[in-house]
Amino acid sequence: MIVKRKGLSRVIYATYYSIKGLRSAFASEAAVRQEIFAMLILVPFAVYVDVTNVERILLIMSLCVVLITELLNTAVEKLCDHVSTDIHLLIGRAKDIGSAAVFVSLLLAAFVWLTILL
């Protein structure tokens, strides 16, 4: 029987599983590690560069969008691999679409950074 947690207990368990998911993605996906490493460099840069607060928020949020998209893509890929390791047209499409979402988020981040900094 599944126990439905409520209140603070639910928040604590949700936080635990979120951190567990981040650790799992970090351990298993090079792209996640690369994006977190890039954020460790670019977020402090965004804090110290001479831009408005709104621009600073946009710079940082664009990096967060990339990481969020990569985490969702990783989840899709892991689920697809669990469903079948065989080559399948629809699984291939799902993985390609997830990859395309990451690519679009990277283009968005590049556009935001170049527009603000140039």
Regions found by a protein language model. Give the residues of each.
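Hydrophobic alpha-helical transmembrane segments
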Residues: 1-75, 83, 87-95, 99-118
